[in-house]
Amino acid sequence: MFLFIIIAVVLLVDQATKAAVQMLMCQGESIPVVPPAFYLTYIMNPGAAFGLLPHKKMLFVTVTVIIIAGVLVGYFKIRPRKPVLDYGLGLVAGGALGNLADRLRYGLVVDFLDFRIWPVFNLADTAIVTGAFLLAWALLNDSDKSSKKERK
């Protein structure tokens, strides 16, 4: 149940921030927040993270559906389930759904977080990366414990 709350919160916050950017900014507009380090820059991204593989909508939709299916399988198969796994799975799925909603609606993804030293991205991207790190940490931490038990 907790997983689905995380997914819903990530999806709602992601879509709300993107809607606000679209209502309040013109495409291509950039607003300094903490110059020169951080700006809000409204772009429509035709590709994946960092603009990779532009205009491959069906590829991204297919991969996203596979990722979400994997999250659900992981959620129901992993026992005992630790909270860090729910957070990781929820962040990845919520972020994936946020970008999927954009792709299905516009054929593009709304991006707006601009640190100038990195390509422009959005909250869904942040959730996906954070969730992936949490999952990797949980799996590595668990494998360390397993290997210590085997050595004893």
From Swiss-Prot:
EC code: 3.4.23.36
InterPro entries: Peptidase_A8
Superkingdom of the source species: Bacteria
UniProt topology in membrane: Multi-pass membrane protein
A single GO BP: proteolysis
Substrates-to-products reaction catalysed: Release of signal peptides from bacterial membrane prolipoproteins. Hydrolyzes -Xaa-Yaa-Zaa-|-(S,diacylglyceryl)Cys-, in which Xaa is hydrophobic (preferably Leu), and Yaa (Ala or Ser) and Zaa (Gly or Ala) have small, neutral side chains
Transmembrane regions: 33-53, 58-78, 83-102, 120-140
Record's subcellular location: Cell membrane
Active-site residues, Swiss-Prot/TrEMBL: 111, 125
Transmembrane in keyword set: yes
Entry keyword set: Aspartyl protease, Cell membrane, Hydrolase, Membrane, Protease, Transmembrane, Transmembrane helix
An example Gene Ontology molecular-function term: aspartic-type endopeptidase activity
One family name in Pfam for this protein: Peptidase_A8
Pathway where this protein functions: Protein modification; lipoprotein biosynthesis (signal peptide cleavage)
GO cellular component, one term: plasma membrane
PANTHER family assigned: LIPOPROTEIN SIGNAL PEPTIDASE
Protein function: This protein specifically catalyzes the removal of signal peptides from prolipoproteins.
Family listed: Belongs to the peptidase A8 family.
Protein name per UniProt: Lipoprotein signal peptidase
Phylogenetic lineage: Bacteria, Bacillati, Bacillota, Clostridia, Eubacteriales
